[in-house]
Amino acid sequence: MSTYAIIDGKMLQIGDQFDHYQIQAYMAQGGMSDIYRAFDLVNRREVVIKIPDQSMLGDPAQFERFQRELEVMKTLDHPTILKGLGSGKYNRVPYLVTEFVNGQSLRALIETSAPFPQEQVLSLIRKIADGMAYCHKNDVIHRDLKPENILITTDGQPVIMDFGLALTKGAHRVTYSNLSATMGTPDYMAPEQIEGQRGDQRTDVYALGTIMYEMLVGKMPFTGDNNMAIMAQHLNGTAPRLDRVNTSISPQLAAIVATCLARNPDDRYPDMTALIEILDHSENADLTILEKVNSSTGSEKSLTQLHAIKGVLIAFGIMGGLVLLALGLQYLHR
């Protein structure tokens, strides 16, 4: 990806005018787009402009992701959702305009301040869940909820952004060549996403549970040397209970997060509204959950592990999958 967007063969620079917007600063790369802070010369306000990378323009699937974000943002209006202000084309290059939010990403805060106090986590997660409940009521599933896609304003309010992977009612399936750019981020992907399913409200519940886990202990529930290893953990592993990782975390809160992170979607909270209700009554509610013990042994355990390996291979669409699968079989029979 270019460091700056290239328009008609010329690199977009600070101070340049792009349509009726004056470029003020280069902010970041997001997905397959370049993101700028700009000044709207017509409406006299600061905005953010998202311009797709040239490589995206030649990739129908990636361009579909950009177009999907345009459509989704037109339908949403909520305090915790980044507000879309418009879109257009300039010199044949499409762009998306959103409000400018003065703050920083939740990722930046986690890197500098995690772990966070329980009360702070519950307050923030409650607000994020409220925004996601609004999305779900409007038939929008985010499917890429992660700290990088959540801004925290200077007064501590969360703002959810980047709906490029969102699933909407009646949306057709798009085939992508790049898994991580399409299905989500491996660290926050629900098992059903890894298996190639489209997902539903419970997919976002899983991602939010992962964010809670990371905020509370400063580490991910699943780790690995590479994306495949991380995805295999999501498919077949069980995250260590939070109250065992950090004994200061209440068993009730640990139970909430464990329920969000259940491998089987049917074992999670059915939607964000149910999660909000539990969070609101966490001090008094009976949050006891049954611990599921993996009693698989011998060939049953091997079959479970093999299923995880195959699921990751299918999700990645690896050309050399048969070779890796053979290595997996050899490992299981050692």
Regions found by a protein language model. Name each.
Residues 53-75:
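AlphaC helix of the eukaryotic protein kinase fold
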Residues 124-125:
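Activation segment signature within eukaryotic-like protein kinase domains
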Residues 87:
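Activation-segment/catalytic-loop signature of the eukaryotic protein kinase fold
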Residues 130-140:
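Protein kinase catalytic-loop region centered on the HRD/HxD motif
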Residues 155-191, 195:
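Activation segment of protein kinases
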Residues 91-105, 109:
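Conserved short submotifs of the Hanks-type protein kinase catalytic core
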Residues 24-30, 35:
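Protein kinase glycine-rich loop
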Residues 185-287:
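C-terminal lobe helix-coil module of Hanks-type protein kinase domains
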